[in-house]
């Protein structure tokens, strides 16, 4: 489970990352752009994006909708950090959704690798080590849960 300091860092950074719909849409597109640049083959899982450019991911209905959906899921996690049963249920739901798409736990590891750069970009040039560590702890929890579901 997440430590109190991590919960605090997640909650405070989330207020900036998900300030409003436009911020969410921009940050979602940024996150997936970084993922696709560092791990180009991950784009194969997102056929609904087609050959969309980074700019199009920020401006088209499909791109904006995906950002909103992903950030809604993350927001549910942030809102449930003090409810272990709910967190486990959300992680299970996330795992099942990704297993259906044949997205394994190693792909969650790729997202973990991209996330520090995303935080630097989305939080205006430098997320603290505490913030990066907190997000890594949350993503590690999701990755570990994903591995357990695949067994």
Swiss-Prot record:
Pfam families according to UniProt: Globin
An example Gene Ontology CC term for this record: hemoglobin complex
GO function term, MF aspect, one: oxygen carrier activity
Residues annotated for heme b binding in this entry: 66, 98
CDD domains: Mb-like
Keywords recorded for this protein, A-Z: Acetylation, Heme, Iron, Metal-binding, Muscle protein, Oxygen transport, Transport
All copies of domain Globin, residue ranges: 1-151
Modification N-acetylserine, positions: 1
Family membership noted in the UniProt record: Belongs to the globin family.
Protein name: Globin
